[in-house]
Curated annotation (Swiss-Prot):
CDD domains, per database record: MinD
Phylogenetic lineage: Eukaryota, Cryptophyceae, Pyrenomonadales, Geminigeraceae, Guillardia
One of the GO BP terms on file: cell division
GO CC field: chloroplast; cytoplasmic side of plasma membrane; cytosol
Residues annotated for ATP binding in this entry: 11-18
Protein name per UniProt: Putative septum site-determining protein MinD
NCBIfam families: minD_bact
Organism name: Guillardia theta
Annotated keywords: ATP-binding, Cell cycle, Cell division, Chloroplast, Nucleotide-binding, Plastid, Septation
Record bears the keyword Nucleotide-binding: yes
Keyword field contains Chloroplast: yes
Length: 269
């Protein structure tokens, strides 16, 4: 039976969907059958970030209405057969799928996959509550900015109130030089405020923009960028592996391939 993890954030624009795409692909590369559920109805982007937008024929909404079978709506990634996407409808609003319907979709998938990752709409409105309904665990994505952290704190409280106790923190778009100059909150600052376990730290890098524009998750790179390696490590931590966090202050791009072999084994290259 699958682990059901919702990827959420308080504030929009913190990179939540990028996180979902890369964690999903990384888990699939680790050998886990992984299904990604785009719950951001009306504003779907997960298909774009995975490069699957031209293959969307049916969405979750057609499954719920009986217009198609679940298997017809699921899109299998040709680069990684362990990964499938259930896309959201683009021309509907967030109220089009209820919490009970989201639970129904998850129940259709839960016995056939090892991981279900739900890409949750930003904010705390109806779409958020519908998306977190089926989840057992949550990853809260924030950037090290005070507004994003404050919104993340609010989301953590709502997740706990809805019975989700396994909540992890992912700090995205960290700029080590700005932290060093005291112009950005450090990871320690964010952890002190939010008081939940840290699962990942992803540095800011222009390669992330290139990756999203191309529809190619960073973890597919043969020679991993620093963010790509950080995403792989995050997936391994989600899987229960103990992996030290990278020292982003002093890290250079040169040893990435060597470190990847050390942490993940040559079979993942």
């Amino acid at each position: 039976m699958a682990r059901i993890v919702v990827i959420t954030s308080g504030k929009g624009g913190v990179g939540k969907t990028t996180v979902t795409a890369n964690l999903g692909m990384a888990l699939a590369q680790l050998g886990y059958r992984t299904a990604l559920i785009d719950a951001d109805i009306g504003l779907r982007n997960l298909d774009l970030l995975l490069g699957l937008e031209n293959r969307v024929i049916y969405t979750a909404l057609e499954v719920l209405s009986g217009e198609c079978r679940l298997e017809q709506a699921l899109i299998k990634d040709k680069r990684q057969p362990n990964l499938v996407l259930l896309p959201a409808a683009q021309n509907r609003n967030k109220d089009s799928v209820t919490e009970e319907q989201m639970k129904f979709l998850v129940n259709l998938l839960v016995n056939d996959y090892d991981y279900l990752l739900i890409d949750c709409p930003a904010g705390i409105e109806t779409g958020f509550h519908n998306a977190i309904g089926p989840a057992q665990e949550a990853i809260v994505v924030t950037t090290p900015e005070i507004a994003a952290v404050r919104d993340a704190d609010r989301v953590i409280g709502l997740l706990e109130a809805n019975g989700i106790k396994q909540i992890k923190l992912l700090v995205n778009r960290l700029r080590p030089q700005m932290v060093k100059a005291n112009d950005m909150m450090s990871v320690a600052d964010v952890r002190e405020i939010l008081a939940i376990p840290l699962i990942g730290v992803i540095p800011e890098d222009e390669c992330v923009i290139v990756s999203t524009n191309r529809g190619e998750p960073l973890v597919l790179e043969k020679n991993l960028s620093l963010p790509g390696l950080a995403f792989e490590h995050t997936a391994c931590r989600l899987d229960g592996q103990e992996i030290e966090f990278l020292d982003l202050q002093s890290y250079s791009r040169g040893p990435l391939k060597r470190l990847r072999r050390f942490f993940l084994g040559s079979s993942t290259n």
